Amino acid sequence: MGQKVNPISNRLGIIRGWDSNWYGGNDYGDSLLEDSKIRKYLNARLAKASVSRIVIERTLKLVTITVCTARPGIIIGKGGQEVDKLKEELKKVTDKDIQINIFEVKRPELDAVIVANNIARQVEGKIAYRRAIKMAIANTMRMGAEGIKIQISGRLNGAEMARSEMYKEGRTPLHTFRADIDYCHAEALTKVGLLGIKVWICRGEVFGKRELAPNFTQSKESGRGNNGGNNGGGKNFKRKKNNR
């Protein structure tokens, strides 16, 4: 069933941590709905900032939001003006104090969310989907990934009948729980309808115990940080060389 299930949810509690870190009581449903609203708002508001992951932590009176992005300067703005503005906007959504941390993804080519969204934007910009996919595969493998698999589905090239095409290079062992597999599904809106884009990236294998809680080690409301566990840079991370 490793081929069917979402690779991220399949590894929760093993080598992958949760994106919402808090304990809920009777208000669990309200907090969950609030998290959904925050993520939906941020993904729409920061569509051009190459956002990879949004981690939400809660205390009684404070909501801490960590945004992982490949373009932190867009979110921070000049002198932090954009962050302050974003904080005020989110206060209206949650009615609680907001703290925003910015974490820079230093190798966006190894992040499935960023890769999938980049392909989708290129396809919407009328770039040939095969060219966009092959460029993404080449860039990802050049950055040291063990393997990548990309599937695109829909009315490709305006065909009357929808079909799926898959492109892959290297290895993506979905049944191996210690394999660090990143996954994302994105959509591209074209004149002939929606195209679905799925991306799997194997960043190596994790040996030994891995800290499941997000390890964002940069200062608050800054755009600099270590590579962390989000894009394959944890201290227990090892790579195997592929002879291609």
Swiss-Prot record:
Classification via SUPFAM superfamilies: Prokaryotic type KH domain (KH-domain type II) (SSF54814), Ribosomal protein S3 C-terminal domain (SSF54821)
UniProt-listed Gene3D superfamilies: 3.30.300.20, Ribosomal protein S3, C-terminal domain (3.30.1140.32)
Biological role: Binds the lower part of the 30S subunit head. Binds mRNA in the 70S ribosome, positioning it for translation.
Name by which UniProt lists this protein: Small ribosomal subunit protein uS3
Pfam families the UniProt entry points to: KH_2 (PF07650), Ribosomal_S3_C (PF00189)
GO molecular function, one term: mRNA binding
HAMAP family: Ribosomal_uS3_B (MF_01309_B)
Bias (Gly residues): 225-235
The keyword Transit peptide is annotated on this UniProt entry: no
CDD domains in alphabetical order: KH-II_30S_S3
Subunit structure: Part of the 30S ribosomal subunit. Forms a tight complex with proteins S10 and S14.
Domain KH type-2, residue spans: 38-106
Any one GO BP annotation for this protein: translation
Segments of this protein annotated with the region Disordered: 217-244
Family: Belongs to the universal ribosomal protein uS3 family.
This protein's GO CC annotations: cytosolic small ribosomal subunit
Keyword tags: Ribonucleoprotein, Ribosomal protein, RNA-binding, rRNA-binding
Provenance organism: Bacteroides fragilis (strain ATCC 25285 / DSM 2151 / CCUG 4856 / JCM 11019 / LMG 10263 / NCTC 9343 / Onslow / VPI 2553 / EN-2)
Keyword check for Ribosomal protein: yes
Top-rank lineage group of the source organism: Bacteria
Lineage: Bacteria, Pseudomonadati, Bacteroidota, Bacteroidia, Bacteroidales
